[in-house]
A protein has these predicted regions:
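Long, contiguous interaction/recruitment modules in multidomain scaffold/adaptor proteins
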Residues: 1-50, 57-60
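Hydrophobic face of amphipathic alpha-helices that form TPR/SEL1-like repeat modules
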Residues: 50-53, 82-89, 118-125, 154-165, ...
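Structural signature of tandem alpha-helical TPR/SEL1-like repeats
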Residues: 57-66, 94-103, 130-139, 165-180, ...
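Canonical positions in the second alpha-helix
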Residues: 69-71, 105-107, 142-143, 182-184, ...
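Short helix-capping/linker turns of helical repeat alpha-solenoids
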Residues: 74-76, 89-91, 109-112, 125-127, ...
Length: 270
């Protein structure tokens, strides 16, 4: 029997016939974890339009579920990840973290980057498994290697995070965090561009480089990162009036209360 046939046979046994709706009043744990991870469609397009909109607007979630099952059984690895993702966070129907882990691992082993990322989320949050930053880091690396640049931001955050509870072994590594943010920035990940620019501009954990810091911050701001526009406005407020006004007003358009406060202060100054 081929590997594809084995997967089809296993899937047919794993997937339940019907889904169970989420409770009318979801508990604290559901509210805490709903929304973690990401579907394949969002991961590939970089936009929220896709499966999440389809689920949010669905009149019959059972029909959506059957369609995802049909596509997964036909060999669509993205649909397999999507099923695992939904059962992982339990936002659209009652979660099943054990089933989610099985489905995500099956999709990941077939090369799906989003599935590797979602496995990382499962181990980071401890959903149906022991919390393990080491496992989360490994899965995030697999996701990045398969093209998911967002995983670089997750790795950067992970290496800056101290373990506050439990007995797992994890070492904060600020230089490693910076290197992951830099890898993500070089691949176009917008938040990573901000993180790199901020560190270079302020000499945070790395040698200060104003020119390089401004370069990355401007790239981030140009793609909608409000904090980057704020940083640029603050930086130029003391040395370049024209660029200060430009970034201040752009930050305001992005919804920045800080930039709006700066404008109000400018207006009342003599």
């Amino acid at each position: 029997m081929s590997a594809a046939s084995n997967i089809h046979s296993l899937l047919a046994r794993l997937l339940p016939e019907r889904i169970v709706p989420v409770p009318a009043r979801p508990g604290q744990r559901h509210r805490l974890f709903a929304g973690i991870g990401m579907p394949s469609q969002q991961a590939l397009s970089g936009e929220r339009f896709g499966l999440t909109d389809r689920l949010d607007e669905a009149v019959d979630l059972q029909a959506v579920y059957h369609d995802l099952c049909r596509r997964a059984l036909l060999g669509n690895v993205g649909a397999l990840n999507d099923l695992g993702w939904i059962w992982l966070n339990g936002k659209y129907w009652r979660g099943d973290t054990v089933l989610a882990g099985h489905l995500l691992r099956m999709a990941a082993l077939q090369g799906n980057a989003a599935a590797w990322f979602n496995l990382g989320q499962q181990h980071y949050f401890g959903k149906g498994v022991e919390v393990s930053y080491t496992n989360a880091a490994e899965y995030y690396r697999h996701a990045f290697e398969r093209g998911m640049v967002h995983a670089a931001a997750a790795l950067g955050d992970l290496y800056e995070e101290e373990v506050c509870e439990g007995d797992q072994v994890w070492q904060v590594d600020l230089l490693e965090a910076y290197q992951w943010f830099l890898r993500g920035a070089q691949r176009g990940e917008t938040r990573c561009r901000f993180e790199v620019g901020y560190r270079l501009l302020h000499g945070l954990y790395v040698e200060a480089d104003t020119k390089a810091g401004l370069y990355w911050l401007e790239l981030a701001a140009a793609t909608g990162v409000m904090q980057a526009a704020e940083e640029l406005a603050v930086h130029f407020s003391s040395c370049d009036a024209a660029r200060y006004l430009g970034w201040r007003d752009q930050a305001i358009q992005m919804g920045s209360t800080l930039a709006l406060t700066m404008k109000l202060e400018d207006q009342i100054q003599p």
